[in-house]
Amino acid sequence: MGSEMCIRDSAIITIVARMFVVFCCLPVHELAHGWAAYKQGDDTAKKLGRLSFNPFSHLDPIGTIMIFLFGIGYAKPVPINPLKFKNYRKGVALTALAGPLSNLVMSFIFAFIGSGLNRLAGANTAMQLLVLFFGFAANINIALAVFNLLPIPPLDGSRVLAVILPDRAYEKYFRYERYIMIALMVLLFTGVLDTPLALLNNLFHKFIYFLPNLVFGN
């Protein structure tokens, strides 16, 4: 019975954590993109009301479903006008990286809180559930950062390619954006990406949890 309750509680906390990420963390991710673009001279997102914590300004139906199914996904990309950037390539790269960086910052905060609570939890069930929640929230944000750094349209990593690839090659790459996205969905559903994503997640997990583990000795 205790084992069944533990599994049930874990499943519920997983769903709650994913809802929290969808309605609280994804808006921060997209707001980070818009803010970075604004700081680079592009006010497009601000004019369109995308510099907002309102989740309904940012949610993408497919990306949201992916988070609930896989724990990874994406939001509606913040519109930018690279022509307004003070430095085109630098602006595109910084704007693209701002989103995943925000996820890593949030994951560190959640990891720190969860690790601290874990020291205090003892046999307190409510505290243990909070530790579980913050652990899930940290891990989902790590997964989102890793996933969005993949160089696949429309993910953030693909925008960084604008800095690396010649203009002609970059334009040709994005010509097949729709097909590349379909291929990505197939790879996710079939589990082909499970191992490489798990390796990357584990690497970032060790990095994020290094200081919390050092401080709290977990």
Residue ranges, per PLM feature:
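Hydrophobic transmembrane alpha-helices and their immediate loop junctions
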Residues: 3, 8-218
